[in-house]
């Protein structure tokens, strides 16, 4: 229920999403529900961040597609990043990130609608939004590259 302040203005509280993981002595990772993932030493935190960025981008797209009755029927893709010392503060961080996704949508929206849906997917992926260096995206939709 929204709270009403003394000045009569209604303050809405943003929805909160909470996540937790556990790290086992063997390096395995588990979610709060107990689902486990055994990761080899070649999986660095940076790789996991990129995997999260790709999954988040697709989940965001799927959300916006669902609102207009369109299905994401298949998807493949990847991401890359450059980590180095930032000029602004001298700390090592992601200074460049790019995402490339190829998706199949049914039914296929009009070109203007596709551009809007892709923009919303990029904007609303909280992993990408959390990065100081905003990711660049390259989308292929139903076999055609979509420049943004």
For each feature predicted by the language model, list its residue ranges.
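Extended beta-strand/beta-hairpin segments
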Residues: 1-52, 58-148
